[in-house]
Each structure stands twice: as C-alpha cells, then as structure tokens.
Amino acid sequence: MAGARGIYGLSGSGIDVESLVKVGMMSEQKKYDRIYKKEVETEWRKEAFADVYSEVNAFRSNMSDMRLSSKTKPMTATSSLSDAVTATANANAGVMSHTVEVTQAASNAYLMTTSGQKVARTNTAAPTSVALKDVAFAGGTMPAGMTSTDTALSFKLSNGTGTTEIKFTAEEVFTKNLTLNDLATRINNARFIGSDGKKSALNITASYDTVSDAFSIVNTQSGTNNKVSLSMDTGASSATYTTALLNNLKLGQVSGGTISAPLSFTISGTTAKLEAAGTNASVKVDGRTYTNLQDNKLQVNGVTYTFKKATPVGTPAQVTIAQDQEKLVENVKKFVEDYNKLLDDLHGRYNNNKYPDYGVLTKEQEAGMSREQVDKWNERAKAGLLYRNDYVRSIISDMRDAVTNRVGSAPGRYNNLASIGITSKDQSGHLKLDETKLRNAIAAEPDAVKQIFSHTDEDDNYSDNGVATRLSERLGKRMESLKSHAGMTADKSDRSELGKLIQEYEKQMSDFKKLMSSFENQLYKKYNAMEEAISRLSTQFGFFSRQ
C-alpha cells in the first residue's frame, strides 16, 4: 500500500496504515475545527456589526441634516420679475413681501472682437490663418535681426490685483506655429505671485471662436475692482508686433448686452495699456439703497437676492417670502420613514434567534455539498448572530428615548413629537405620522418643527436638545463603542476587539496545524515501526516453518 509517508503493507500484515492514521488524527481535527468555527463565526459577527454601523451612520447623517434650518423651516422666495431678480430665503427670513429695485447689475470686465468684425491679419496673404505669425507679422515671416530665442510677442496681463507676463519666443511663433488658441490657453493658465509669495489664478479666461473668427477675454469675477488689463513697454523690441496682435483682435468692451467699438491703447510714458473694468451693482431693497456691490448677490434679513439686470423704471420687483409647508411635511415624513426603517432592521437583528441545528460548516463538510447548498446553509447559520446583543439593544433604547421625551427648550404646547402628530403606534416603538395634526401645528406655530427637531443646547443639556440633535449625538457615541468593539467594516486588521480576536484565532489555527503535522508524522513513524517488526516476525516464522 502506498502511504503519504512511505509504502506500507509489504509485510502482508494486513494493517491499513492510512485508515489508522486518519482515525488517530480525528480527535485533533475536531479540536482544529472548533477553533475554525469560532474564527468564522467571529468574522460573520464582525460583518453583521459592520452592517449595523453603516446603517446607523447613514441615519445619523440624515439627522445631522435634519438639524439644519433648511430642513425644519424651509422657505420659498418668489419674484414678480424673475428675469431681473431672484431670491432664496433661510429660516431667519420673515413671512412677508419685499420691494426690490435694481438700478444696475454688477458686470464683468469683458473684451471681445467687435460685432460685425473679425480678427485682422497683418499678413494679408493669409486672411483666415489662426497662426500668431500671420496675425502679428507682415508676410508671416520672422523680421530681420530677430533670432529664435528672442521674445517675439509680450504683454502684461492684469486682473486689477495681480499681474503676469504673457510672452512667446520667435521659435514658438515661427517654428512651432502657435495659434490664437495657444494664446487663449496661455491666458487661461496664467498665474501671478501674490503678496504671500504663492501663485494664484488671475481668474481671467480667454477663447477663440473659429466660426465667428472672434477672440474674447473675460474676468470671471464682477465689479469695478476686477479688470482685464493688457499693457506693454513701448520701448521693447516686441512692442510693434504685440501692438499689431492686440489691435488685430479688434477687442471692444461688452456691457449691458452691447459691445463697443474696438478699444485703443492709451499711452502713459513708456507704457501702452488697453483696459476694461466691470461694474458694481446698485440696488434698493425695501427703500434702503445698496451701492458699490462687487457682485450680484446681497443678503438682507435671511433673504439672499441675485440680481440679473435692471428693473424697469417705476416697476420694482416684489419678492414674496413664505414657509414651504409641503417641503416641511415631506421632510418630516422622511424622518419617520428613515427612523422606522432603522428601528425595524435593529429589532430584526436583536430578535432573530439562532437555528440550533445550523452551525459553521467545516471545509470537509463544504466539499461534500453544492455551492447552492452551502449558501442556503450559511444563510441559516448566520441567523441570530446579534440575538439579544447589548450593543444593538442600547442603540434601540437611545432611539426610543430620543423621540419620546419632551424637548425642554421648546416653548408653548408644541414641545414633543406627539404634539405635532408623531406618535408610537406599537410596543416596538414604530412611529406613525398624523399629517393633518402636523399641518395644523405648522399653521399655528411656524417654528414648531424647528424647535422640536433642531435645537442644540449651549450647555449640552440632553433634555433641552431637539430630537435630531439627541439622535445625532447619542448615536455618535454608540458608533464609537461599535467601532472599538467591531470596527466599521469587515476588515480584521482594524484593531477592534473582534478584529484582534479573529487574528488570534488565525494564529491558533496556524500553530495547531503545525502540531497536527508533527503528530501525523509520529503516527506514520509508529506504524512504520510496526510494519518493520511484523516483517521481521514473518521472516523468522518462515525460517522455522521450513525446518
């Protein structure tokens, strides 16, 4: 017989060595399997806790949102002239109408090839070329005396705060044939060094439109302080060609939906400059004038206005602020749904008992089953992993406590969930919503939901905190405990208690495997010696039988 540790049975002893070794190893294999089953079950339990952590975390995130006034007191803002002014309102805004006059909206510094014109070319032989050499240089050729390393084009670009240089060498212009698109790219990538020594974006963008043969440069920020300024040293060797380039772009200033004639360079000493600035907004809200607004936004008493253009003279916009009751009811409904969903899941895990006849399968047992059979078995074997678990029980208890108790900081009769139509409908703590009662409460006290849900006490007094605040803070603490015990994921290397336990079981299995291998070798040696002894006896018996 061929064995795993040698060849046996040649003596004719009839001993089944393999079977004897296997029987001898059975008790050791059972010991190993007990550790293996503990390790697998701990992995499953860790995975179950990871699911709980994820679900609680998602709900807690929703509770953090529910603390926001935009959730507990959403407001609407409607403008009678939405093409001129729009608005949004937060919970601090009063339910009322506002009169808004826009004298002038803020605008950006904006240069563009003048309407009805196209980019001109100094090289008249190439009237549609986009190459810089044809736009700025006669004949599209390098001037005499200029070398490839010389600066062919150069100007300063400023946004009113920072300045940088845009330049091209003769090699880039005449050998690499850079184009108007490359000019736009170089402007878009421009940076300047600020007073802090760090590079900052100019917030100036440029583009070339091949269809209309037009070039544009715009400062992305509005207001008079934000400019587009192009300047150069008139004494520089590249000044003549740079002037030709910028003049040929035919840049006019865009303002109020119209575009001016091409701007000209103004000369001051040795500097030539072409510049456009944005405009500030000037508005009047409820009779109060606001001037020199750098952008088109203004917040007054919880209302944020956005200005688009001037309102007609004598016809101001009416901006009406109202509470968004439908949105508020929708938010409360979602809270109830989210709460019940999490509570149902936790109750399911807490009350789900084990199947006593289903445990972790050994590798040998799995080998004798189909994949489908193993999956079905494991589905039942995983039941009850968190049955009557203290961590789950604590979360359920905190959730129910948070929604049941009165909010001490809420004035008047609307001071708990029941007062606005949210009550427990059964022993499980499942919530139900009386929508009519909720709407009546909102109508009677617009701040009712906000007071009950989102209040955060300065002294962190639990009884004075709102429901969403209580849930967020209590669940946060429970999540820290879960994290310490089981981690946030199924990863065993997270240094959680269960993660460390899994690693300890794995070490025990590894060490026990070595002991089993040693014990198995001892068994083979034992039966090998037995075979040899029987062989010697057989030889002696044969000798005496022949006498």
Question: What are these language model-derived features?
Answer:
Residues 127-143, 147, 151, 173-185, ...:
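Short, structural beta-strand-to-alpha-helix junction motif
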Residues 1-57, 61-63, 81-106, 149-159, ...:
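Polar, low-complexity export/assembly segments characteristic of proteins
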Residues 112-124:
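Short Gly/aromatic-enriched secondary-structure transition segments
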Residues 124-129, 174-181, 239, 255, ...:
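Short, amphipathic alpha-helical segments
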Residues 68-73, 111-112, 196-200, 412:
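Active-site phosphate-binding and catalytic loops of NTP-dependent enzymes
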Residues 111-113, 227-228:
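Short, hydrophobic/aromatic beta-strand segments
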Residues 164-179, 329:
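Short, contiguous acidic and Ser/Thr-rich linear segments
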Residues 69-85:
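Active-site neighborhoods of enzymes that stabilize oxyanions during catalysis
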